[in-house]
């Protein structure tokens, strides 16, 4: 079978993940980060319990269609007040564990959606 290069090859994809790391295009990251199709940004929030309303300002400024919040090894839902600014900006939010967020991010990038994955390891 003849394979062709994918035109989406220039987008950031999550190529691996595990306990305490995520690899984006093969580059390993060991701290919280925000992954978007065109950039990867460090995220100052180290753990779920550190989330505050201002934690989402960086991702909100990028104006994604949807934010995937990866909450570490298990799914944990933030208080609605913490994410109110996303709702007010009409940015969707999906909360899931880190592994599900990584998989979902890649699917949405393949669909050429404006997605941001805000990924926490703890």
Please give the residue ranges for each predicted region:
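Residue-level recognition of alpha-helix initiation/capping sites
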Residues: 50, 76-77, 99
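A short, acidic, amphipathic alpha-helical segment used as a generic capping/interface helix at domain edges
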Residues: 51-61
């Amino acid at each position: 079978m003849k394979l062709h290069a994918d035109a989406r090859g220039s987008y950031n994809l999550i190529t691996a993940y595990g306990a305490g790391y995520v690899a984006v295009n093969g580059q390993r990251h060991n701290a919280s980060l925000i992954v978007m199709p065109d950039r990867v940004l460090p995220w100052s929030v180290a753990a779920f319990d550190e989330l505050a309303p201002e934690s989402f300002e960086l991702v909100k400024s990028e104006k994604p269609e949807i934010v995937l919040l990866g909450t570490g090894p298990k799914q944990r839902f933030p208080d609605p007040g913490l994410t109110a600014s996303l709702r007010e900006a009409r940015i969707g939010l999906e909360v899931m564990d880190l592994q599900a967020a990584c998989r979902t991010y890649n699917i949405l990038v393949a669909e050429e959606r404006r997605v941001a994955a805000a990924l926490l390891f703890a």
